[in-house]
């Protein structure tokens, strides 16, 4: 005999199902469930008097020797990923996602994809949202607190460069030379996050860059503050092609070594990741945004200019002066800073993101951006664009799935593809490391509930440890057991070049973390950017007005006075 529940009651018990939508935070974005792997009436729910008990939803006989038995089940999760928005149980074993579907006891339940046994832990995610851990490709390694601040907004992987608050690191995302690369690899070995380091891409000989890749750098960064010259770019790209590592560039704002067209020529059709492609963070003034229309260029943004608000322009000038070691008493330094801040290109940047012409969102952490705001700014921008541009094609009332999948890809799968780590992380897919972020829908985009690294709870909202329950105040994000001891080494990854990996860099310098090589970075095009592969035929920036035109049509938007996911979430 069946038991009937109305839709609202079912959602309260088991989470949304097909036909339901979930509002994301206080935005006007709604995620509609596209598929539900649940068998109604046989949901795997944990708790007193519930299903996941011995001999019911939990197998009474299967041991962990059975590879179908998982270490952790995340039950009833609403998964938001570039691959889709679905409702499913997630099975984790040995730190990786081994199944997405339906978990339980095959002796008592139908259509079970993986087994819950005596060795299985349960995380109840009914009514909660699960995303892949965020990846920030543009981090200045200035403060050792960056990983924790990133985790506070769901960032689990950091790529960038630096050695601490040295002036070179304050300005550029480069870790220069074997000594610094070695020491920084050792420094982050006990930090609960994934890391990759970018070499300094300068010089008229390839050897000066090659030695850094051999030392363990996972990519190369050419930056104007060290000189973004034709020779430096060309030689860095030669090394990137030889060793299969990513190449990123912060181009020449002053146009001293050449103009945008000269830099484009230096690329020679090779794959390039352009940082802050709008230009306020740096790059050819005023027309770096032209790069967003090139097939061989993978363009990213930094979060200080996203979304475009009434206060955005005001803070940018001071940021540039401090970040790039400029002197307000020198008129030329002030002119340099002013040349980079253009409200017209900032306005166009929002729209290009919404079109899918800008593929990646990053922070530029501590050097004009905030590592703890990558995810939040991404969803604020999506919300602003829905309000100003309306639904994307294929979206409808209470269904913004196309826009949601486009924006989640900007800080998960696309940065993973760009830096050659998509085989390991970047999406909620079977076979990848279980770097997962669990959100309450009301807090989505602002404050995670739990963060898993390599299948282990590492950060999360936790109450007073001296209380009788985990819920009493103050409930704040705190480190959990995965952030301590040898667990850090077993659940986090250091990414290096294939050369360094093959030549035993882990043993050579005494690393304890998982060490993995980056790969498949050199034959990428804009078409490889998931749901963000639009390459306009022509992008033109008027040199006098700085207005942006795509195929001769003006591209702009208005600044907003208030954003979603802002003050009501951060009272202090």
UniProtKB/Swiss-Prot annotation:
Enzyme nomenclature, EC number: 3.5.1.5
InterPro entries: Amidohydro-rel, Metal-dep_hydrolase_composite, Metal_Hydrolase, Urease_alpha_N_dom, Urease_alpha_subunit, Urease_AS, Urease_asu, Urease_asu_c
Keyword Transcription appears in the UniProt entry: no
GO CC, one annotated term: cytoplasm
Active site: 324
A molecular-function term among this protein's GO annotations: nickel cation binding
Protein origin, superkingdom: Bacteria
UniProtKB keywords: Cytoplasm, Hydrolase, Metal-binding, Nickel
GO biological process terms, semicolon-separated: urea catabolic process
Record pathway: Nitrogen metabolism; urea degradation; CO(2) and NH(3) from urea (urease route): step 1/1
Disulfide bonds: none
Binding, Ni(2+) 2: 221, 250, 276
Residues that, per the record, bind Ni(2+) 1: 138, 140, 221, 364
Binding site for substrate: 223
Keyword Transmembrane: no
CDD domains the UniProt entry points to: Urease_alpha (cd00375)
Post-translational modification: Carboxylation allows a single lysine to coordinate two nickel ions.
PANTHER family on file: UREASE
Stored NCBIfam families: PRK13207.1, urease_alph
Record protein name field: Urease subunit alpha
Provenance organism: Streptococcus thermophilus (strain ATCC BAA-250 / LMG 18311)
């Amino acid at each position: 005999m069946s038991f009937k529940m109305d839709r609202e009651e079912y959602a309260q018990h088991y989470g949304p199902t097909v036909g339901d939508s979930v509002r994301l935070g206080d935005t006007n974005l709604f995620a509609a469930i596209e598929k539900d792997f649940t068998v109604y009436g046989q949901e795997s729910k944990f708790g007193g008097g519930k299903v996941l008990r011995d001999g019911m939803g939990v197998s009474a006989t299967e041991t962990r020797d059975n590879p179908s038995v998982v270490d952790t089940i995340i039950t009833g999760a609403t998964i938001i990923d570039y691959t889709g928005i679905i409702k499913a149980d997630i099975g984790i074993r040995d730190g990786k996602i081994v199944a997405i579907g339906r978990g339980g006891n095959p002796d008592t339940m139908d259509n079970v994809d993986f087994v819950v046994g005596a060795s299985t832990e349960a995380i109840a995610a009914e009514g909660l949202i699960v995303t892949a851990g965020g990846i920030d490709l543009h981090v200045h390694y200035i403060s050792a607190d960056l990983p924790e601040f990133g985790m506070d907004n769901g960032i689990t992987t950091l790529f960038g460069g630096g050695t601490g608050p040295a002036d070179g690191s304050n300005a550029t995302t480069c870790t220069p030379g074997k000594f610094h690369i070695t020491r920084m690899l050792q420094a982050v070995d006990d930090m609960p996050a994934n890391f990759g380091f970018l070499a300094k891409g300068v010089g008229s000989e390839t050897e000066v860059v090659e030695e850094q890749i051999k030392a363990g750098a996972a990519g190369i960064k050419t930056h104007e503050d060290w000189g973004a010259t034709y020779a430096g770019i060309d030689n860095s790209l030669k090394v990137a092609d030889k060793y299969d590592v990513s190449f990123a560039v912060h181009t020449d704002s002053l146009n001293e070594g050449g103009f945008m067209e000269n830099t484009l020529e230096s690329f020679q059709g090779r794959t390039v990741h352009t940082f802050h492609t709008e230009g306020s963070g740096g790059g050819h003034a005023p027309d770096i945004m032209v790069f967003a229309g090139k097939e061989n260029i993978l363009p990213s943004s930094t979060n200080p200019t996203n979304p475009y608000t009434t206060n955005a322009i005001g803070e940018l000038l001071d940021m540039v002066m401090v970040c790039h070691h400029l002197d307000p008493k020198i008129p030329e330094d002030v002119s340099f800073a002013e040349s980079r801040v253009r409200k017209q290109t900032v306005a166009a940047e929002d729209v290009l993101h919404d079109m899918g012409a800008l593929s990646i969102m990053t922070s530029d952490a501590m050097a004009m951006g905030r590592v703890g705001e990558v995810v939040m700014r991404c969803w604020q921008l999506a919300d602003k664009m829905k309000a100003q541009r309306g639904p994307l094609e294929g979206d409808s009332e209470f269904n913004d799935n196309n826009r949601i999948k486009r924006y989640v890809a900007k800080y998960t799968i696309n940065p993973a593809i760009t830096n050659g780590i998509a085989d390991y992380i970047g999406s909620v897919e079977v076979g990848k490391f279980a770097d997962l972020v669990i959100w309450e829908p009301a807090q989505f985009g602002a404050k995670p509930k739990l963060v898993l690294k390599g299948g282990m709870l590492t950060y999360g909202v936790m109450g007073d440890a001296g209380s009788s329950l985990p819920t009493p105040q103050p409930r704040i994000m705190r480190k959990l057991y995965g952030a301590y001891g040898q667990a850090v080494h077993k659940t986090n990854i250091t990414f290096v070049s294939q050369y360094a990996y093959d030549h035993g860099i882990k043993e050579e310098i005494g690393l304890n973390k998982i060490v993995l090589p980056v790969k498949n970075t050199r034959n990428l095009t804009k078409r490889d950017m998931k749901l963000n592969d639009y390459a306009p035929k022509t992008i033109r920036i008027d040199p006098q007005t700085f207005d942006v035109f795509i195929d001769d049509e003006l591209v702009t938007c208005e600044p907003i006075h208030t954003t979603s996911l802002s003050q009501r979430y951060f009272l202090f």
